[in-house]
Regions:
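Iron-sulfur cluster-binding electron-transfer modules in prokaryotic oxidoreductases
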Residues: 1-242
Length: 242
């Protein structure tokens, strides 16, 4: 297969976790995709939208739409930003001068695991990752994009990986909707409780589709020297290939 795909890299990944983007590209190329990346690509406007600055979100959203209007699949290593385009952009661009372009980008935008499982029909990427891990569901993934089983299917095929489920895998990490900015103590308390639940269950790794959640967990883990680490789904899927 030689499927040409665009990639959309969230700001957080671009600026702080470029290895996540690189690992996603490796996975896509392993499956035969011809990956395209526009170096002028910027932000989807998610934080501005969540904080009520819809005009600012629309301004950067217009730029993103024009950069991605190629009528090919767009793959994003983060459900939160993919959900902004698929679920929030209608409030900004429906019946606007960019209506047709936004509908095209909305239709073609996929979070990584959703794309791999439901478009590429992939499950076993050939990965090997020695760990007892939890798959943490990002709020946007579950509630807006309805993504829950796709990452678990992919992880179930990873050699030497044992998945552990606890009630906390379905909880908010504590930073959603700007809680980390508006109530830091509560945000940290929520994150700390979840991490401890994972440790008590025997997990040594927290895996997620979203670096937003993982960054929040990682800051708590490092500050308190806790015996657990974080890993983006793309990192796990790109690990241990023969």
């Amino acid at each position: 297969m030689n499927l040409k795909v665009d990639i959309f890299i969230p700001c957080l990944v671009d600026q702080y976790y470029p290895d996540v983007a690189n690992n996603m590209i490796k996975v896509l190329e392993r499956l035969g995709c011809d990956v395209q990346y526009n170096v002028e690509q910027t932000c989807c406007g998610r934080i501005a939208f969540e904080d009520g600055y819809w005009d600012h979100c629309k301004e950067v959203g217009e730029k993103l739409i024009m950069e991605l209007q190629h009528e090919r699949y767009i793959v994003c290593p983060g459900a939160a930003c993919a959900a902004t385009v698929k679920c929030q952009y209608p409030a900004l661009f429906h019946n606007s001068s960019l209506h047709n372009q936004y509908k095209s980008v909305q239709k073609n935008m996929f979070e990584l695991s959703d794309f791999l499982v439901n478009v590429m029909n992939a499950s076993d990427i050939g990965a090997r990752y020695n760990s007892k891990a939890v798959m943490f569901d990002a709020c946007k993934a579950v509630h807006e994009l309805k993504i829950k089983q796709a990452p678990r299917l992919l992880l179930s095929k990873v050699r030497e990986l044992t998945l552990i489920e606890t009630p906390s895998t379905y909880s908010c990490c504590g930073m959603s909707g700007g809680l980390d900015r508006n109530n830091e103590k509560l945000s940290v308390d929520i994150g700390s409780k979840i991490i401890q639940d994972f440790i008590d269950a025997g997990a040594d790794t927290i895996i997620s589709t979203d670096m937003d959640c993982l960054m929040h967990f990682d800051s708590i883990i490092k500050k308190n020297n806790l015996p657990i680490k974080v890993a983006h789904l793309a990192e796990v899927l790109a690990a241990g290939w023969n």
